[in-house]
Amino acid sequence: MEEEKQVKVLTQDGERLLTEAETKRYYNLVNKTKELNEKGYTRRDCLLSVKTANITGNLVMLVPVAILCVIYVIANGFNFMPKAAIAQYGGLAPLYGLLAFLVSIAGLVVHELIHGIFWAMGASRGWKDVQFGFIKKNLTPYCTCLSPIKKPIYIIGALMPMMILGIGVSIVAILMGNPFIMLFGIVHVFGGAGDILIIAMVLKEKVEGRDVLIFDHPYDCGFILFEKK
């Protein structure tokens, strides 16, 4: 067992010193890699920069957001415009809008919880392998899995937050004709931008064997693919 001393690594966004939590995950990956290599798996790191993920991901998500907004307008008209919203909700409309936005931000915690629920289904130790945390630099919560999981479970776990909080809530908003609920849904469609890019990367990776495991990267943006041919 290697001594868990803090290490400096080169990530897609530059060199930096790992945090205590990242250091523990780093050594966990070292040990998991050894175990899987002994079982005949080969390792492949699949990474992208946070900047690329944010820019490309949000551009990609403009398509489903535009489609949802068009459907909303067809079904409910432009009741989200300031004058229409005030006519319908009175002077409380701005407050409702602010509240919807704040609840959307708070929903990021639920977003990560949904990741954890589905990934725990495929983790070797269930919930014990699911770790939650908070990135102070970006002011964002995160969820990661400490064990490699089957490819389908990884994809489902990555996709579900956007499907439930984004697409699902947006459909409810369209049916109810509620612009504030729609705001929540749209925020969480954009919130799934990085997840969609990761899923695309997983599907793009060519594998020769059927035994494929995906390991959430311990400190960088991306994942590690283990394949047994």
PLM regions and their residue ranges:
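Metalloprotease/metallohydrolase-associated module, dominated by Zn2+-dependent proteases
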Residues: 2-77, 134-229
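Membrane-interface segments at the starts/ends of alpha-helical transmembrane spans
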Residues: 47-51, 85-96
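Membrane-interfacial hairpin junctions
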Residues: 74-90
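Short pre-active-site segment immediately N-terminal to the catalytic Zn-binding motif
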Residues: 90-108
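Active-site recognition of the HExxH zinc-binding catalytic motif
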Residues: 107-120, 161
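Active-site-flanking alpha-helical
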Residues: 114, 118-123, 168, 202
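Short, conserved, surface-exposed binding loops centered on an aromatic residue
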Residues: 122-124, 147-148
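Juxtamembrane non-transmembrane "cap" segments at the membrane-aqueous interface
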Residues: 125-135
